[in-house]
């Protein structure tokens, strides 16, 4: 009896875990299953299965253009966020810099501000400086949102870096720039790769900032949102499934790179 009561918390936590996992995976599983339905509407039972919806999606010019546009924005914002985030991380760990805690707090602020508030404030900002909505504004918004993640990952890596590596490079005659590119940057490599992948995922998935800052060209989330307004269909499920598979693969690779950065 005593053992039964002792195991009760563990059993409850296990049940909660599996219930939560089911809550997360069941909608995704249903979405993927519906993408194979051989009909123009979503309903149970699925009936006949087909790959026609995937073929239609891959021939959809709007979908392909939205994918390319999303990738372009993700690449630009990732490059900007990685450069800025790395510089901020090095500023935080540098000697003789005052207010490092404040710098870190301000750098991480975009990650905790609600997306709606961030989008509205950015829209007000670009209106103030007479910057038109569109590609540049979207890249700015995605960069601001992604910088904190690069800062945290780069900072974690920098704090584990032996200080004698840079000192040894300087003793051998390297200046600060050469030491950075020959020593610091290679050491930061795994963390930066993981941070860049997270930036790509954040950018491709970002809907709120894109909605407020975008122009007439739709990104992938905007296109799917527009299609959903006309009702759910297996075509939309096929689009979402393709995005899910790609982002899941990229996310798993990012997790691998993060673990590698922590263990090296």
Q: Which role fits each region the language model picked out?
A:
Residues 1-8, 75-107, 124, 163-164, ...:
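Transmembrane-helix boundary motif in ABC transporter permease subunits
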Residues 2-15, 155-170, 176-185, 237-264:
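C-terminal transmembrane helix and the adjacent membrane-cytosol boundary/short C-terminal tail
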Residues 3, 42, 46, 51, ...:
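Membrane-interfacial helix termini and adjacent extracytoplasmic/periplasmic loops
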Residues 3-9, 39, 54-62, 204-255:
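Interhelical loop and adjacent transmembrane-helix boundary motif
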Residues 16, 23-28, 143-144, 151-157, ...:
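Transmembrane alpha-helices
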Residues 40-77, 229-230:
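Periplasmic/extracellular loop-to-transmembrane helix junction in inner-membrane transport proteins
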Residues 64, 68, 72-84, 88, ...:
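Hydrophobic alpha-helical transmembrane segments of multipass integral membrane proteins
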Residues 65-72, 121-150, 189-191, 196, ...:
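Loop-to-helix entry region at the N-terminal start of transmembrane alpha-helices
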